[in-house]
Amino acid sequence: MSLLDALNEPQRQAVMATDGPLLILAGAGSGKTRVLTHRTAYLIEECGVNPYNIMAITFTNKAAGEMRERIDQMVGYGSESIWVCTFHSTCVRILRRYIDRLGFGTNFTIYDSDDQKTLMKDICKRLEIDTKMYKEKMFLSAISSAKDELIDPIEFETRAAGDYVKRKQAQVYREYQQALKQNNALDFDDLIMKTVELFKLDKEVLASYQDRFRYIMVDEYQDTNTAQFELIRLLALKYQNLCVVGDDDQSIYKFRGANIYNILNFEHHFPDATVIKLEQNYRSTQNILDAANAVIANNQGRKEKRLWTDNGAGDKITFEQLDTAAEEADFVARDIARRVRKGEYQYKDCAILYRTNAQSRLFEERFITANIPYKIFGGVNFYARKEVKDLLAYLKTIDNGQDDLAVRRIINIPKRGIGAASINKVALYAQEQEISFYDALCVAEQVPGLGKAAAKIRPFVLFIQSMKAKAKLLSVADLLQEVIETTGYVRELEAEGTDEAEARIENIDELISKAVDYAEVEEAPTLNGFLENVALVADIDSFDENSDYVVLMTLHSAKGLEFPNVYLAGLEDGLFPSYMFITSDNSQAEIEEERRLAYVGITRAKKNLTITSARVRMVRGQTQYGKVSRFVREIPPELLSREIYEPKPKEESIEQSAFQKARKAFRTVPSYGGSGYGKEVGEGYGSTFHSSKATKPVYTKVENQRDFGSAGGTLSYQVGDRVRHIKFGDGEVMAIVSGGRDYEVTVDFDKAGTKKMFASFAKLKKV
């Protein structure tokens, strides 16, 4: 069987176009990964290209892993020499070899967002900046944007001219970069910027990589920023065999620095480029695709394409406009439960996508009440947890003593009796001597005014030195366990004897497991490599397609994923698109970015798509009346199951209906007894359609439900009782405080730790 037999005609053309610049415009679900893997195999098997000369760049570890697996299966022997990496991991591999030419050590540390915040806090304190007026986040954002555009501190300062805030940012940027270099550390933006700097500084290094990577493929090209574009341009400059795959209609990361003009102007940058469109979709039904096509056609800044499929027309798109956001969440919860009960879908087939993270709260509350398993993406990353960061800081210190943030984090973990005053004296001495904090600790007896504290520092230094020696002999997992054992970190947690401490120990066990897994998959595992691997992990990479739970995530997080049953929630003008973009000075460009986001959301659905909106919702504590989003109104009526109807009631009727319902939603909970689940879509909800004969949703007042509890009634439990929560499990009631309309209950759960919650939502059962 030929490599090309499984491909459609445009896909075959893309695979066989091997020489010169190539732009593949790959619509959503059009099989771009298949094209990239087949193209790689075709280069090797049909064109005789050495695998060593091929590079494939993606944006996420998940995508890189999937592509690597497919290439290994297709190519077999020799595939291991192909670079299949993310932009960041590609740059790390290059910098580990040559960054010493820029004055950094090759064992540099990669700072995550928490490290950046800590460093920025130190800099603002040192520069005596009023952080109430100038937020650390503002400085970090300005610096990140500058690096995306390859603007260094000197150029930034030049551009600042007479702008006071820009000049302040320039000052902080300069100090920030100096601190990074002193710590022998790079942030994520530096990884790409420093690689470009290296290539421009050292033509020999650039030439060596140009000769190696004669065939370059870049996935998700529409998401590249200026720095990434320049990196690719430099690498492809000599041989011009650059294949980029992307979809301008899915360019949704402008806020991260993505430049849509990289893909729109590809033919301008590479005049000899071939352009091939992949428009056949293998994911969705034609009705879903027609809706997506109709919406995105309203954008002016795009390359014309129209998705089609052989999957059939499929069901019409369901649109439900509810009176309140609470009713919207209630509708979605009931609809999912009904479909799962009827065997149409499993929970894992369902996803709720929304514009802002704040929208998840009501869905969470309804799912807990309805006993629907769910998971939110975008929560606390595993590697951001205290115990994990503490132990990683030990490993970073062992690997790179120049990393001041890591050393200062663990100098008193566990407590060594080294006071803040002593630490400040060491830090000041390090600054004056222009040495690292760790190097200053090594000569603590020379620090003025340190006195007896130097004796307390000495054991810490000796411990780190001994670990540095052991790091050359032990695996990462064994080294980690040695650190845990010698410091007594876990023993201290065990001594606490709390469920929270037990959960933290489980996280430490998971970190050890991660170290073991790393050693099993890497040919030459190193401590530095492990830390690099951890630093490059993103939250979405942990998405488990096999676990049976409903997924809740923002539309930005959903890109690249697909689900049989999708709910797009909160489709109202003012929320999506947001009021900020509607009223901005550059509103057309902003609205087009939002429309691309809507297009991404629609095309996540494989079989069923439900779009919901609310006539009124609480936003930042204010009542907001929402008109159905323009993106819904751009969908042809014949594709929707019902006609959109937007009545124009008098102002007082709004106050007496929607607003009162919004207030009521915060005082009551829906009854999930026997009324609601199993009804057809649109039944039992406040939907506003011409054809709707639906009654209002049934709500049961809290005070009439003894098990829920309220300040107006009695609770079935008291302090000291054992209770059960639908999500957190069993625990002991520690406190009950009356809050007027409701009780605030504090429960120490066996596994989830201590939680405070309102009795009406908690639905605690005495056990």
Residue ranges and their predicted role:
Residues 3-6, 42, 218, 226-322, ...:
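Conserved RecA-like helicase ATPase core segment
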Residues 4-19, 227:
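N-terminal pre-P-loop "Q-motif" helix
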Residues 19-22, 40-215, 237-240, 260, ...:
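A basic/glycine-biased coupling hinge at the interface between accessory DNA-binding modules
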Residues 20-38:
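Walker A/P-loop
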Residues 28, 213-224, 228, 248-249, ...:
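Conserved Walker B
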Residues 30-36, 99, 271-274, 279-373, ...:
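Helicase P-loop NTPase motor core
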Residues 158, 162, 346, 360-372, ...:
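Conserved helicase C-terminal RecA-like lobe
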Residues 571-753, 761-766:
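C-terminal accessory regions
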